[in-house]
A protein has these predicted regions:
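Carbohydrate-interacting/catalytic domains
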Residues: 1-153, 157, 162, 179, ...
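Conserved alpha/beta catalytic core and glycan-binding cleft of carbohydrate-active enzymes
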Residues: 356-521, 526, 534-538, 554-558, ...
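Short, flexible loop/turn elements at secondary-structure junctions
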Residues: 26-28, 50-52, 62-64, 75, ...
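Core domains of carbohydrate- and sulfate-ester-processing enzymes
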Residues: 75-140, 211-225, 279-303, 418, ...
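Hydrophobic faces of well-ordered beta-strands that scaffold small-molecule active sites
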Residues: 155-157, 199, 263-265, 339, ...
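Short catalytic/ligand-binding loop motif for oxyanion handling, primarily in non-cytosolic enzymes
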Residues: 78-82, 165-167, 207-211, 271-274, ...
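Conserved, mostly hydrophobic/aromatic
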Residues: 24, 71, 159, 201, ...
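Substrate-binding/active-site clefts of carbohydrate-active enzymes
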Residues: 125, 160-336, 343-366, 386, ...
Length: 719
């Protein structure tokens, strides 16, 4: 076999049409072997003799796409000094563009002996671990272009590749649970009809099913356990894992883009799947443990601000390079449109504390590729000072956990919530305005993958996570949920009716709030997880979206999950209507914060926003401070939008009155005078059916409208 010197850049395996260049960074190694793996179980070892700036490299003519490979790193094994080299372990390339196979868990994939953790384990891991794969970078993108949907037009839909597609009756069996399933016209049609503009995918980077979960008969369904930051997860491919997963993912992105839907990836750059000092040796740990991980003062142990056993070393230039290379790769080569960063506060930890000016954010800010896509932070981690909502730099948007908590509190009847609710409804200026950000920095959500589904939020007071095998100890215990009078399944019609109303309240509030709304997949069908608020390990019907069939009943695959109340197509229709109402009216998705006064240049004497008690008088400070107050009316002035259109034109819109009754009693609302003479009801969450355009009741200033307990009504006045 010919071995040429090759190049130190780019890192990873790079196929050029005639052969492949291999390059891997390691400061810890004495010697590195590239192992080409053959289908008969044998391997050909090639020593990487060339080294530039601690990058070992070689070029191998004739090595083609589909070739499986790994590295064996020879060097010191001294955990007490943070060194864990072990040439018996076949290691994944940190820059692998595809990964083949899965782990067969056993002592072979660990760097130590189970019965003697201080002793190096020299069992060969190759037959038991995954392999890196050389991929062909060439793909016919045609005329693919990123949709580049502006934030004020964006409606996010958080989804799991398998969970969204596994039970869809319109998908061929072989496409369910796959990237190709995402690209199927039946799935795309649902997203388009719902009004979704961006699909936020839960992790699709190559991840690992934990040893502990596999032993329990479970697996890491959510996927927040990355081992390959450049490789699409191979189990989501419908037709092979020797690079086919890359082509299938690209094809899915191309199809979604053709439909005008952006693809945003949930990425986990805060830790890896190698766990703590008792975790397996799969890649980074054996290549250069000191360079990749944050270690404690006793370097045999790992610092953990993620709750997973380890944290990547964010002050290491090689970790930062890997993350930035990964982000650029997914944008330039895979054509994704943005990222949601899991536990993003960890990315700001150069040292112990969270630093919003850390090197990572500097690198993102100046990067001509990454800085131009959507950047969404999950603005917290489990370390000290990790809750950082409102503290990310101006380029970033954030999952607004305070929005979620406040909206939940309002509709479950918590006292003293109106003032904060007003802030959340109008874009959370208290969090974002001072540093020059706009309402669009707030990603508003009521539910997401982590926690109760929308159905379960109104059906359970307590978590029911027994199926996870941890005696219901896992998952959040403070859910701000309310079961409407009965825990879980019930035949009580009044409870069921109230639950339906509450779900409509949450959807309507979300879609009528300033900021960027995010729907959790299946909530439009009232998907239930039977009270499990931490279904990270439930790769089964509990987590998969149940779709209606053509007749509107339960989807193929049987009845609804045990105890479920069926597929709610009425809620889907309501959700569609609210999404499209939002999309059609710029006053519901302003790019600037409200002023609370008349806007200069609009020739309108009315404020751009006004707040009223149910009696129709403007709110006073005493009203805001009232512990019992749980109802109000909001006036949104469509004639007082301060921001111009894309060509500098003045934007005008219809005006709206949003009436909220979060109390346990019916309340008579007076339509405010002096803010418009004639109005029409366009949304009423007390009614199970979705209103047809123009069919709502007409009312005039001074009229009374009775809102039943825990309901919401929206009035519209033409511009």
């Amino acid at each position: 076999m010919q071995v040429w010197p090759g190049e130190a850049y780019p890192l990873g395996a790079t196929y050029d049409g005639a052969g492949t260049n291999f390059a891997v960074f390691t400061e810890a190694a004495d010697r590195v072997e590239l192992c080409l793996l053959h289908d008969d179980g044998s391997e050909t070892a090639v020593e990487l003799r060339e080294s530039d700036a601690f990058v070992r490299h070689a070029y191998l003519p004739g090595v083609m796409p589909g070739q499986r490979y790994g590295f064996r790193v020879h060097g010191p094994y001294d955990p007490g000094r943070g060194l864990r080299c072990n040439s018996a372990k076949l290691l994944l390339d940190p820059y692998a563009k595809a990964v083949s196979g899965s782990i067969r868990w056993g002592e072979e994939v660990y760097g130590y002996h189970f019965d003697d953790p201080e002793r190096r384990n020299d069992l060969d891991s190759a037959p038991h671990t995954m392999a890196s794969v050389v991929v062909n970078p060439y793909f016919d993108w045609g005329d693919d272009r990123p949709p580049r949907t502006e934030y004020h037009h964006t409606v996010l839909y958080e989804a799991h590749v398998k969970g969204l597609t596994m039970r869809h009756p319109g998908l061929p069996e072989e496409l369910r649970g796959t990237y190709a399933g995402l690209a199927h016209p039946a799935v795309i049609e649902h997203l388009r009809e719902l009004g979704v503009t961006a699909l936020e995918l839960m992790p699709v980077h190559q991840f690992v099913n934990d040893h502990r979960l596999v032993d329990m008969g479970l697996n890491n369904y959510w996927g927040y356990n990355t081992i390959g930051f450049f490789a699409p997860h191979n189990a989501y491919a419908s037709w092979g894992d020797r690079g086919q997963q890359v082509l299938e993912f690209k094809s899915a992105v191309r199809a979604l883009h053709e439909a005008g839907i952006e693809v945003i990836l949930d990425v986990v750059y805060n830790h890896t799947a190698e766990g703590n000092h008792l975790g397996p040796t799969l890649s980074f740990k054996g290549i250069d443990n000191l360079s990749y991980y944050r270690l404690t003062d006793d370097p045999q142990y790992y610092m953990d601000t993620t709750g997973t056993g380890n944290s990547l070393l964010m002050r290491s230039p090689h970790v930062l390079q890997m993350i930035m290379d990964s982000l650029r790769y997914w944008v330039t080569e895979m054509h994704v449109d943005g990222f949601r960063f899991d536990l993003a506060a960890t990315l700001a930890r150069q040292f112990h504390e969270v630093d919003r000016l850390s090197s990572f954010f500097d690198l993102v800010q100046q990067d001509p590729v990454v800085s131009q896509v959507k950047l969404i932070a999950e603005p917290w981690d489990v370390g000290e000072g990790g809750y950082q909502v409102g503290n990310f730099p101006p380029l970033w948007t954030e999952w607004n956990g305070k929005y979620r908590d406040t909206v939940r509190d309002l509709w479950r009847g918590e006292q003293r919530t109106l003032a904060e609710f007003a802030s959340r409804l109008t874009g959370s200026s208290d969090l974002y305005q001072d540093d020059g950000r706009r309402p669009l920095a707030s990603i508003n959500f009521v539910t997401c993958h982590d926690g109760f589904t929308l159905h379960d939020l109104v059906s359970y007071n307590d978590k029911h996570n027994e199926a996870n095998g941890e005696d219901n100890r896992d998952g959040e215990s403070h859910n701000r949920s309310w079961n409407c009078g009965a825990e879980g399944d019930t035949d009580d019609e009044s409870v069921l009716e109230l639950r339906q109303r509450q779900m409509r309240n949450f959807i309507a509030t979300l879609m009528l709030s300033q900021g960027v709304p995010m729907i959790s997949h299946g909530d439009e069908f009232a998907r239930t997880q039977q009270g499990n608020n931490n279904a990270y390990c439930q790769d089964n019907e509990l987590s998969w979206v149940q779709w209606p069939d053509e007749e509107g009943g339960a989807g193929e695959g049987g009845e609804a999950a045990e105890g479920a109340e069926g597929v709610d197509t009425g809620l889907r229709d309501f959700t569609r209507a609210l999404v499209w109402l939002r999309r059609e009216h710029p006053v519901l998705r302003r790019r600037r914060f409200f002023h609370g006064r008349p806007v200069e240049g609009t020739h309108d004497d009315l404020s751009d926003i006004a707040w009223f008690t149910p009696e129709g008088r403007e709110m006073t400070q005493q009203d805001w401070d009232s512990a019992q107050a749980s109802a109000l009316t909001v006036f949104l002035n469509g004639n007082a939008i301060s921001e111009p259109g894309t060509r500098g034109e003045r934007v005008t819109d219809d005006s709206f009155l949003l009436m909220f009754n979060a109390s346990a009693e019916p309340i008579d609302f007076v339509v405010p005078v002096d803010h418009g003479r004639q109005w029409q009801v366009v949304v009423d969450t007390a009614k199970p059916e979705t209103m047809q355009e123009g069919s709502g009741k007409k009312v005039e200033a001074g009229d009374r409208l009775t809102l039943v307990d825990r309901s919401m009504t929206v009035l519209q006045r033409p511009a």
